Regions:
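N-terminal leader/signal peptides at the extreme start of proteins
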Residues: 1-25
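Residues at secondary-structure transition points
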Residues: 19, 30, 46-49, 108, ...
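Intrinsically disordered/low-complexity terminal segments and short unstructured peptides
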Residues: 14, 22-25, 29, 97, ...
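Low-complexity, Gly/Pro-rich coil/beta segments used as flexible assembly/activation regions
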Residues: 66-185
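Ubiquitous "structural anchor" signal
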Residues: 8, 21, 41, 48-51, ...
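N-terminal hydrophobic or amphipathic segments with adjacent small-residue motifs
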Residues: 18, 27, 34-37, 58, ...
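Aliphatic-rich helix starts adjacent to a transmembrane/signal segment
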Residues: 25-69
Length: 185
């Protein structure tokens, strides 16, 4: 019997097959990866959208701050012009400035001999010309409105408040600046 000793004995039952390890992804792993990538991209898109919106708001607020400061400077210019023109007692330092308690606009492009620079506020929008100057002359309309309110609490003081209003993506915004001007002459 040794004659067949080189023959391997057959094992009874199932013999395991040699299976190589699979290197691909399962369907579940693929779906999880797609979900993670989608959530990440949505987060990035949301951050970009908010950044663009806040950049627009910041730009508008900066413009509003400059327009408010310009409104105060216009009122200061009228007061200083009154001083320089050596107004008489009948034409005081605050001439042309005391009729704005309900609100005025500063139309410095208005030309007449009396130069009524402060006119009644009626919700007018500022316009911008080709050089970037804001005024009420017929140019390109903007989203900004400027309202100048001047109160005279006593003989030697004017309280100047400038409100800038605008709307951004359907939401109203405003910016205010205040200054006290005195008859220090």
């Amino acid at each position: 019997m040794r004659k067949y000793s080189n023959i391997k004995k057959i094992k009874k039952g199932f013999t395991p097959l040699e299976v190589k390890a699979l290197t691909g992804f399962t369907l579940l792993e693929t779906l999880v990866a797609i979900f993670v990538i989608t959530v990440g991209l949505m987060g990035v898109m949301t951050v970009l959208q908010m950044t663009m919106f806040l950049t627009s708001i910041s730009s508008s607020r900066l413009t509003a701050a400059y327009l408010a400061q310009e409104g105060i400077e216009i009122v200061r210019n009228v007061r200083d012009t009154n001083w320089l023109e050596a107004r008489t007692v009948a034409n005081d330092w605050d001439e042309g400035l005391t009729n704005c308690s309900g609100g005025c606009i500063a139309d410095y492009t208005y030309s007449s001999q009396l130069d009524p620079i402060l006119l009644a506020y009626a919700g007018q929008f500022l316009n911008i010309d080709g050089n970037g100057f804001y005024s009420y002359s017929p140019d390109t309309p903007t989203k900004f409105q400027r309202k100048i309110i001047i109160q005279k609490p006593n003989f030697d003081r004017l309280d100047v408040a400038v409100q800038i209003m605008w709307s951004e993506k359907g939401k109203p915004y405003n910016f205010s600046a205040q200054e006290n001007l005195y008859n220090w002459r």
